[in-house]
């Protein structure tokens, strides 16, 4: 069997707020947007810079709906060049750090819809450092 990863779908309540998080804070880029008036929903496909294939599909239903807590979804993971600089940038933009990069290798942040985003340091872990080393999980 030949499998190829396509994308992860994340259902969102507020498309503008989610795009602000995924694009402005995380740095993903919109590679396609499709509005479906007859179905009353919008799909937005996002990719990390330098990737041509969508990795995240944001699905926004136009009619109000109650979405689950998000933790049962699991998470989406991205590799970053500098875990500390990335977390500092996200924190400055108001993003919640669920698990700080105490080990210099891994952190989790939360999207507006309570989806966990894992950030992994590229290559070897960085030397553990403050303020991350003593920061508790959220």
What residue ranges belong to the model's regions?
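Vicinal oxygen chelate
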Residues: 1, 4-13, 31-34, 42-48, 64-138, ...
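Core segments of cupin and vicinal oxygen chelate
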Residues: 2, 9-53
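Generic domain-boundary/flexible-linker signal
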Residues: 19, 67-69, 125-130
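Active-site/binding-pocket entry motifs
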Residues: 51-52, 64, 125
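Short, mixed charged/polar active-site loops
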Residues: 53-55, 116
């Amino acid at each position: 069997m030949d499998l190829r990863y396509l994308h992860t779908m994340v259902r969102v309540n507020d498309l503008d707020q989610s795009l602000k998080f995924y694009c402005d804070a995380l740095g993903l880029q919109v590679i396609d947007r499709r509005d479906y008036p007859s179905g009353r929903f919008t799909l937005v496909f996002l990719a990390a810079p330098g990737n041509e294939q969508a990795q995240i599909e944001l699905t926004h239903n136009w009619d109000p709906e109650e979405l689950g807590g998000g933790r049962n979804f699991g998470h989406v993971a991205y590799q970053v060049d500098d875990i500390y600089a990335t977390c500092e940038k996200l924190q400055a933009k108001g993003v919640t750090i669920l698990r700080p990069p105490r080990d210099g290798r891994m952190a989790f942040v939360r999207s507006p819809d309570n989806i966990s985003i894992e950030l992994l340091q590229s290559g070897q872990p960085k030397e553990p450092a403050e303020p991350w080393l003593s920061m508790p999980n959220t």
